[in-house]
């Protein structure tokens, strides 16, 4: 049954009008999408759109942004255009809409001329409710000629942070979308994004020429994601230990270079872990293969550059690890937002080394001194402060976006394992003395080698084994001294100087009172072990479900998805399966009460799941 057939059955509701009541939106939410209630902010945004108002919607990833425009699209009588930046994201959204019986399609460069003509014919004949297009396509003369033959009721512009030079993912073609307002003066425009600070919001309003818009700024908080930072000591070993703890869960590892992506993916494969590389240097066919394998649960982990980002709508990504420092908090937030989109517990882990920050800073400082450089330096400084923070990471993250909270989250490494302070004056003096004695011409690892009394050849050649500081820190590990040096850098007592490919440590003027012992210094006890173990369970998460039944339901879902040639989460996501495993419905009347089961999916997919649940119950009864 399609949505159009479903509409005909709902004869009491007049879908021919471009104005519908709140009850209609709620009815669509229940019957088409299978959810029992709206999330915070969704209904007010939908009602504003149905009242023909433009809107700006800033809502966290996983917060239900898509429903904000998909439900009005079903209420309006004409076509809804959705501007989306990535081909993969378009296809994924369309697949999910089709699974719910909604007539949707896309136009992009991956299609042949004949395929595009077929889609255009469907749109012009009124057979489509939603049409996804790229911003580049939306600006072409041929597109405007075609779309002039369609009744466009509504326009949604997704990922609108791309419109702003302040945004972390600037796309120049987005800035030209303001022409949509003139071309479709009667169609309300909705701009959507998960990440936009004040400057970015202003750019969106100006460039899209939104008229007296309804502005909804939701919470940026993702309470089901635990944020942790790992100080890099033996990075590959630490990453391998973290992956081992995931026990086969799906995840994404982000790196800043293609070479590193390839090396890490190969290293994981050698350990028997299902992992694939993804970066811009691969062919389109290779990238599509990896993305498809990941979405279909045929690959556990994707190791990627930022090229692998917005196109991922997979709901059961359980962790995102950043092996390198991102360039901004917006980028970090957007990328970690790929985890836990089903509202179940997920992890975001940042592997951090101050040298990563120094290299990124050097790259930016070598750019021409233009406003864009200052913007990027400001954003880099903010992510550096996030990494070095000694207070709740979630508070730092939310404060950056102007959402001020006072209560710690109890779901980050700082809250779960608060830093312990100690009198670090002597340790600081040892490090600073070593830096000074070797002429302020060497990097952190060399300073540590001197402190620990290493017998390496380079130290002997420079006769630094004869210095008074040689070996005065041999009672502490290399990792311990790395942590001390990082803190001294963060405190501004020593600085990293980059010259070509070398990073040297030098003292700042602020170091002199410490060297002389004229003022005290508190340092955090080095956190040699890394990732905190506790996980806060979000309010919507199901906890007392039958684990054996859940595993069987997941196996059945994969079997059905492979047969239908769609990703498993499009059948039902993990949160829906967990509800099934808890409440164990055995009739269609019971199944329709499960979140994520709408009329279309009930008829298309429910019977095998109902049969499996009945079989499981009989087996359990017989076993008892």
Question: What spans do the regions from the language model cover?
Answer:
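Helicase motor core with emphasis on the C-terminal RecA-like subdomain
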Residues: 19, 23-32, 36-40, 44-56, ...
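C-terminal accessory regions
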Residues: 379-404, 549, 555, 562-564
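Flexible coil/turn residues that form the inter-helical turn or adjacent wing/linker of helix-turn-helix
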Residues: 185, 247, 390, 440, ...
């Amino acid at each position: 049954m399609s949505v159009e057939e479903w509409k005909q059955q709902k004869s009491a509701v007049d879908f021919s009008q471009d104005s519908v009541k709140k009850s209609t939106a709620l009815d669509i939410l229940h019957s088409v999408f299978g959810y029992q209630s709206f999330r915070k902010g969704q209904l007010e945004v939908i009602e504003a759109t149905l009242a023909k108002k433009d809107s700006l919607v800033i809502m966290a990833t996983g917060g239900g942004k898509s429903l904000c425009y998909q439900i009005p699209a079903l209420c309006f009588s004409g076509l809804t255009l959705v501007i989306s930046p990535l081909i993969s994201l378009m296809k994924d959204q369309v697949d999910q809409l089709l699974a719910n019986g909604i007539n949707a399609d896309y136009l992009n460069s991956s299609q042949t001329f004949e395929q595009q003509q077929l889609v255009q014919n469907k749109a012009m004949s009124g057979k489509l409710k939603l049409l996804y297009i790229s911003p580049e396509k939306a600006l072409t003369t041929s597109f405007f000629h075609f779309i002039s033959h369609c009744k466009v009721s509504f326009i949604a512009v997704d990922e609108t942070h791309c419109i702003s030079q302040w945004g972390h993912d600037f796309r120049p073609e987005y800035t030209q979308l303001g022409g949509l307002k003139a071309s479709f003066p009667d169609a309300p425009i909705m701009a959507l994004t998960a990440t936009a600070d004040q400057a970015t919001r202003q750019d969106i309003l100006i460039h899209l020429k939104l008229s007296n818009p309804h502005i909804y700024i939701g919470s940026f908080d993702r309470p089901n994601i635990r944020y942790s930072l790992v100080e890099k000591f033996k990075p590959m070993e630490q990453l391998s230990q973290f992956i081992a703890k995931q026990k086969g869960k799906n995840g994404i590892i982000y790196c800043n270079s293609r070479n590193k992506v390839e090396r890490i993916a190969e290293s994981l494969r050698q350990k028997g872990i299902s992992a694939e590389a993804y970066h811009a240097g691969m062919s389109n066919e290779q990238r599509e293969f990896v993305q498809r394998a990941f979405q279909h649960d045929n690959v556990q982990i994707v190791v990627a550059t930022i090229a692998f980002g917005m196109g991922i709508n997979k709901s059961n990504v359980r962790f995102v690890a950043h092996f390198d420092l991102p360039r901004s908090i917006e980028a970090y937030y957007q990328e970690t937002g790929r985890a836990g989109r089903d509202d179940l517990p997920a992890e975001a882990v940042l592997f951090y080394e101050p040298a990563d920050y120094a290299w990124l800073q050097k790259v930016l400082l070598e750019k021409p001194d233009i406003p864009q450089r200052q913007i990027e330096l400001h954003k880099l400084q903010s992510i550096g402060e996030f990494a070095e923070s000694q207070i709740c990471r979630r508070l730092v993250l939310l404060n950056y976006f102007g959402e001020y909270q006072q209560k710690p989250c109890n779901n980050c490494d700082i809250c779960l394992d608060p830093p312990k302070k100690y009198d670090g004056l002597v340790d600081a003096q040892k490090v600073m003395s070593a830096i000074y004695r070797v002429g302020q011409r060497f990097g952190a690892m060399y300073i540590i080698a001197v402190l620990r009394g290493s017998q390496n050849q380079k130290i002997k050649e420079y006769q630094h084994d004869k210095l008074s500081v040689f070996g005065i820190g041999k009672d502490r590990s290399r990792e311990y001294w790395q942590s001390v040096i990082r803190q001294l850098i963060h405190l501004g007592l020593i600085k990293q100087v980059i010259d070509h490919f070398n990073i040297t440590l030098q003292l700042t003027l602020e170091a002199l009172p410490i060297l002389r012992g004229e003022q005290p210094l508190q340092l955090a006890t080095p956190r040699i072990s890394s990732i905190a173990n506790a996980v806060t369970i979000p309010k919507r998460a199901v906890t007392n479900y039958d684990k054996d039944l859940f595993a069987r339901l997941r196996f059945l879902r994969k079997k059905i998805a492979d047969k239908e040639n769609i990703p498993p989460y499009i059948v039902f996501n993990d949160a829906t399966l967990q509800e099934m495993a808890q409440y164990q419905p055995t009739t269609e009347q019971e199944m329709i009460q499960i979140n994520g089961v709408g009329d279309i999916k009930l008829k298309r997919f429910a019977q095998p799941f109902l049969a499996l649940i009945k079989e499981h119950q009989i087996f359990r009864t017989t076993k008892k």
